[in-house]
Amino acid sequence: MIRRAHTSDVPLIKQLVDTYAGKILLEKNLVTLYEAVQEFWVAEHRGVVIGCGALHVLWADLGEVRTVAVDPSVTGRGIGHAIVDQLLRVARELQLQRLFVLTFETEFFGRHGFREIEGTPVTTEVFEEMRRSYDIGVAEFLDLSYVKPNILGNSRMLVVL
């Protein structure tokens, strides 16, 4: 079952993220996860959280898929795909037109229609406004130089909804 995350899920989300931190996901502090809990959806099986993913709104027409993680003991069963499908549904409900993801998992996201992109697909005016954000994910989307060490090897992908 895919459902909205609860604050009580945050320690379990942290455990999932920690499994992949420094490999395919950036490390997340508990406070960061609590601050963003309303963006998260979780996969639950028999009362246990086995996967997570978040949808973060970047701009009026643009969102980002973040922090998709599945318990290694249940990978390959479509759980990650179910989470991303839910995030795509929510993005459409919010009337977002495009979703961005920064990922090593290009084949996985490609199955959901994401395509690799170069550059930052926003106007100069929007770029300048987005630069004011304190969110590190926005800086990664904008490809700002101070986040380059965090994103080396990742692919920038976008899907039009």
Regions found by a protein language model. Give the residues of each.
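A short beta-loop-alpha structural element at the N-terminal edge
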Residues: 1-13
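Helix-loop element at the rim of GNAT/NAT acetyltransferase active sites that forms part
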Residues: 4, 16-28
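A conserved beta-strand-loop-helix scaffold within acyl/acetyltransferase catalytic domains
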Residues: 27-46, 50-70
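Conserved acetyl-CoA-binding loop-helix of GNAT-fold acetyltransferases
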Residues: 70, 76-89, 100-101
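Conserved active-site alpha-helix within GNAT-family acetyltransferase domains
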Residues: 93, 97, 103-131
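C-terminal "cap" of GNAT-fold acetyltransferases
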Residues: 122-161
